[in-house]
C-alpha cells in the first residue's frame, strides 16, 4: 500500500503563486520547470494537461503532453519530455498564459497512467483517455494577469 502522496512542484513558481512573465504569451512563452515525486505503483507513463478554467469562453487548454516515460521525474524549462497534442490554440506545443483581462488560474495536472502509450490524437480524446487510464493525479496551479 502506498502511503506517500503523488506531488508536483516547480522551481519556476509556487503553488497558488504568480507565474513569471517569461512563461506567458507576453514573454518568452516557454514552459515552466515541473518536478514530481511518489507516483503510484504500477505507473507506466505520465500525461500532462495545462489549462485555464477562467477563460470567458470555457476552459482553454494550453499544453497537452502524452507518453512521458514512467522513469521521468522532471520536465525542464523549455523542454518536451513526450508527445505533444494539439491544444486550444490549434498547435501541438506549449502556449503560455494570455488572459484578456483579470487574473486567471493555470493548472498543470500530471496524470500517472496504467498504459505506456496513449491512443489519443486530439484534445477531446486526450481528456477522455487520461480519465480512463489514470492511477493518480498531481496538480500545481499558478496565476497570471495581463501585464
Regions picked out by a protein language model, each given a short descriptive name:
Residues 1-147:
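N-terminus-centered regions that define maturation/targeting leaders and the start
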Amino acid at each position: 500500500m502506498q502511503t506517500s502522496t503523488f506531488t508536483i512542484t516547480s522551481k519556476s513558481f509556487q503553488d497558488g503563486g504568480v507565474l513569471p512573465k517569461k512563461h506567458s504569451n507576453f514573454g518568452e512563452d516557454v514552459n515552466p520547470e515541473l518536478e514530481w515525486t511518489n507516483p503510484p505503483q504500477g505507473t507506466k507513463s505520465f500525461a500532462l494537461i495545462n489549462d485555464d478554467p477562467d477563460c470567458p469562453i470555457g476552459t482553454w487548454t494550453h499544453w497537452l503532453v502524452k507518453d512521458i516515460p514512467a522513469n521521468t521525474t522532471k520536465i525542464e524549462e523549455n523542454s518536451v519530455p513526450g508527445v505533444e497534442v494539439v491544444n486550444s490554440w490549434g498547435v501541438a506545443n506549449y502556449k503560455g498564459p494570455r488572459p484578456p483581462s483579470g487574473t486567471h488560474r493555470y493548472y498543470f495536472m500530471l496524470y500517472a497512467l496504467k498504459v505506456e502509450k496513449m491512443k489519443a490524437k486530439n484534445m477531446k480524446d486526450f481528456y477522455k483517455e487520461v480519465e480512463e487510464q489514470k492511477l493518480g493525479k498531481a496538480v500545481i496551479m499558478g496565476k497570471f494577469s495581463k501585464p
